[in-house]
A protein has these predicted regions:
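Surface-exposed, secretory/extracytoplasmic low-complexity segments enriched in Ser/Thr/Asn/Gly/Pro
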Residues: 1-120, 124-127, 149, 175-177
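Exported/periplasmic cell-wall-interacting domains
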Residues: 111-185
């Protein structure tokens, strides 16, 4: 999946190559004793783990636009206004995937910025900053609902992707664990 243009382009899958280690060691051993400078490297073809048929929903987050785009393969399903990380807690660029999902999550703040709430579980409810929907994307980051909908369209989070409750619910119900998430400028 290529998102360099800001939207997903699915590239055809193809076989890869894997070096045959033991055969390569044997070839190298023989080449060294004969002072050969060039040797063939024995390889085996391997099938791709993921093919075009395996791809479903794709999330692309464009931070400068404060927008999350939900695609069904290459077709845009919907777009949503979001909040991303503040300058001192930037949302990182990169390729992620949904590692788990939780409805009505408990928030357990572990970062220094949580101050007096650090280490104290915040149960589901109106005071929970994760809102009613959490989609973990690894590295302590997530896409989640927020009770602070006035911050949408701004750099306002501590690195996570904040969404309106209705939007987070829609995305939560459309994606599954393993859904790719691309965060770009």
């Amino acid at each position: 999946i290529d998102v360099s243009k800001g939207y997903p382009v699915i590239k055809p899958s193809r076989d890869g190559l894997q070096v045959k280690r033991q055969e390569t060691m044997n070839v190298l051993s023989g080449a060294l004793s004969k002072h050969q400078r060039k040797v063939p490297v024995p390889v085996a073809a391997i099938k791709p783990e993921l093919t075009e048929a395996d791809i479903g929903k794709i999330i692309v987050i464009r931070k400068k636009e404060h927008t999350l785009y939900l695609y069904d393969k290459e077709d845009l399903f919907n777009s949503y206004v979001i909040a991303v990380g503040m300058p001192q807690y930037p949302t990182p660029n990169g390729r992620f995937h949904v590692t788990y999902k939780e409805k009505n999550p408990t928030w357990l703040p572990t970062s220094e910025w949580a101050k007096d709430k650090r280490g104290i579980p915040q149960p589901p409810g109106p005071d929970n900053p994760l809102g009613g929907y959490w989609m973990d994307i690894g590295s302590g980051l997530g896409i989640h609902a927020t009770p602070y909908e006035g911050t949408l369209g701004e750099d306002a989070s501590h690195g996570c992707i904040r969404m309106a409750s209705w939007a987070a619910e829609e995305v939560f119900n459309k994606v599954k664990v393993g859904t790719p998430v691309y965060i770009i400028d």
